[in-house]
Amino acid sequence: MKINNVLTAKFIKRPNRFVAYVYLNNEEVKVHVPNTGRCREILIPDTTVVLREGTNPNRKTKYDLIAAYKNDKLINIDSQVPNAVVEEALKNKKIQPLVKFNNIKREQTFGNSRFDFKLWDDSNNKYYLEVKGVTLEDKGNCMFPDAPTERGTKHILELIEIKESHMGAGILFLVQLSGAKTFSPHKEMDKKFSEALTLAHKKGVDIFCYDCNVGEDYIEIKDPVEIIL
């Protein structure tokens, strides 16, 4: 996935979930952060960050803060990216367990939840897929969530309902960096989410995790990552 109109800056501070300040061309500039997670281990003062220039002249901020360097590793933090990357991967048959599904629709409802994807094959076998972006990483070990997520737990419980309704159901964790070794739920951050994910696995819901190739102006799905529940 190509990302246009990118440039680098230095991170200063993030006063709230939606706004940050950076040094750009020797000026302090207010930018939008397209990620409501905490990202505390990534957005550290003087860190080099990647900005994307917006195309809407009426927006309040000119730039989005979409990625940051953690040591020499670039981490994409844009919460809109995972669905786009996964859609591209589904269409290009890059997710091996799901290659039989030729039909793909975004943002489809089941029960009281809207899921990221509804897939079906030529025999009309249906499959609902939820995608979660992962940015929390330590020495190659990745975790989700980095903040409590009632909505995430609700999605998992409804994926179990889908599976029990004799349809396919899965959740895909997309690690928005390269070189991930393992993935596990962040039990200390959100015990209910972790318990729901373990229950879903026992009930037959598919759990996938992939990392990405990440550059300042691109991101694409890469390799499966070992899952530890």
UniProtKB/Swiss-Prot annotation:
Name of the encoding gene: sfsA
Would you tell me the protein name for this molecule?
Sugar fermentation stimulation protein homolog
Family, per the entry?
Belongs to the SfsA family.
| Pfam families in UniProt | SfsA (PF03749), SfsA_N (PF17746)
Q: Which NCBIfam families match?
A: sfsA
Where does the chain cross the membrane? none
What's a single GO MF annotation on this record?
DNA binding
- PANTHER family assigned to the protein according to its UniProt record, in alphabetical order: SUGAR FERMENTATION STIMULATION PROTEIN A
